[in-house]
Amino acid sequence: MAASCVALLVLALLLLVLLLGLWKRGRQTGRARHMVVVVLGDVGRSPRMQYHALSLAQSGFSVTLLGFYNSKPRDELLQNDRIRIVKLTDLRGLGAGPRILQYGVKVVFQAVYLLWKMMRMDPAAYIFLQNPPGLPAIAVCWFVGCICGSKLVIDWHNYGYSIMGLVHGPRHPIVLLAKWYEKFFGRLSHLNLCVTNAMREDLAENWCVRAVTLYDKPASFFKETPLDLQHELFMKLSHTYSPFQSCSDPSHPDTERSAFTERDCQSGVVRRLHGRPALLVSSTSWTEDEDFSILLRALEKFEQQALTGDSLPSLVCVITGKGPLREHYRHLISQKHLQHVRFCTPWLEAEDYPLLLGSADLGVCLHMSSSGLDLPMKVVDMFGCHLPVCAVNFKCLHELVRHGENGLVFKDAEELAAQLQMLFSKFPDPAGKLSQFRKKLQESGQQRWDESWQHTVLPLLAHSQMTPRPHPPCGHPSCRGF
């Protein structure tokens, strides 16, 4: 009896959705100029989808952006009259029952909730969806598109099942189910974007999905930070984080000092302190695909070299970001008692993060792709700020970092430690390797996001209006299952 009631309720809900969809499908007015951007994650920590929304708005479209609102997005997004943010609610506190049951309940809740939210919106020409996370968003967005006449655009950042595999193992039933789901529904999209050529080739060969590579590019606000703004940022952070505080009082009462800079309050002139520490920056989502023990071991080796009297500076190591393993690594950091290295693990405001990168001396990236097919956006942002980078190696990193040309690549803590010692030797040396890398980045004239998006995505939208189906039938064996 209970099962029959549930079935009738589901059928009634589907009928209601279908009737609403048919009514909305008839409302053609404004659809061609309306776009929906969906991220089943924190909008504030999804910069690429924020960039999509901004680029669409700058191209004259009205945009509805759906996502969780755990972190504040950029002001440019919030202040844009063409962009409306619809906040999604995450289901939390499912502490009872087996984990697989909790996961199933969460997926069902998200599917129904996302469907309800999207059906209440005005019809859109395109639905832009970030994947991962794509469960259950790909199926829901495809279903809404079928009912309302919208075309689905999937932006493949990685494979969701490969991230799940880091936690559960690659042969876990949930992981295999997620892979099947991702492959099946991923083929139903009208357009596909991806972040590397390696992923584009993998999608074509193994999934029969045709995608266009849209590399991550730095937004215009990622640039070198002027010295006066560096000082303001350091003073702001010094109120909360002791590594930014000056170790000594200024000699004059009209002087304002941070750990790196000082400002004459009368003249307003800012200068870098002689003997200042070097500022090393890394950003992370604190997940299993980034092993920060590599950096910690490398810094311990750096400390040993500094204690022997080598011409190495002290370091302030700033690791920004939020994520599930943050407290684990903060505990490990608290057990390190280093004389020449100080740690700081802040979560920065969206506007302060580019300023920090533009003020730093070196960036370190520990991202190791779960699929081996995506690239770390943090390195893109660092390059936009002309910040030299040391990055841990994986399969397609060469599409972004070219060892010895625009950065350095390492495989373990020993190699990273050697690179840190080489780069910071006689710091700050204008003729040193660190300065040479920065100069190369300054001269590279790299493309920015707006230019890349206008050149790559906008023509696809215009062409797709005349192309009903981009995926022809495929007979490749890999497209018939796992």
Swiss-Prot record:
Belongs to the glycosyltransferase group 1 family. Glycosyltransferase 33 subfamily. It is found in: Endoplasmic reticulum membrane. It comes from Mus musculus (Mouse). One of its GO terms (molecular function) is chitobiosyldiphosphodolichol beta-mannosyltransferase activity. Keywords: Endoplasmic reticulum, Glycosyltransferase, Membrane, Phosphoprotein, Signal-anchor, Transferase, Transmembrane, Transmembrane helix. One of its GO terms (biological process) is protein N-linked glycosylation. It catalyses: an N,N'-diacetylchitobiosyl-diphospho-di-trans,poly-cis-dolichol + GDP-alpha-D-mannose = a beta-D-Man-(1->4)-beta-D-GlcNAc-(1->4)-alpha-D-GlcNAc-diphospho-di-trans,poly-cis-dolichol + GDP + H(+). InterPro entries: ALG1-like. This is Chitobiosyldiphosphodolichol beta-mannosyltransferase. Pathway: Protein modification; protein glycosylation. The chain crosses the membrane at residues 3-23. It comes from the Eukaryota. The modification Phosphoserine is found at S242. Residues 1-2 are lumenal. Its EC number is 2.4.1.142. Mannosyltransferase that operates in the biosynthetic pathway of dolichol-linked oligosaccharides, the glycan precursors employed in protein asparagine (N)-glycosylation. The assembly of dolichol-linked oligosaccharides begins on the cytosolic side of the endoplasmic reticulum membrane and finishes in its lumen. The sequential addition of sugars to dolichol pyrophosphate produces dolichol-linked oligosaccharides containing fourteen sugars, including two GlcNAcs, nine mannoses and three glucoses. Residues 100-120 dip into the membrane without crossing it. Residues 24-99, 121-482 are cytoplasmic. It is an enzyme of class 2 (transferase). One of its GO terms (cellular component) is cytoplasmic side of endoplasmic reticulum membrane. Its main location: endoplasmic reticulum.
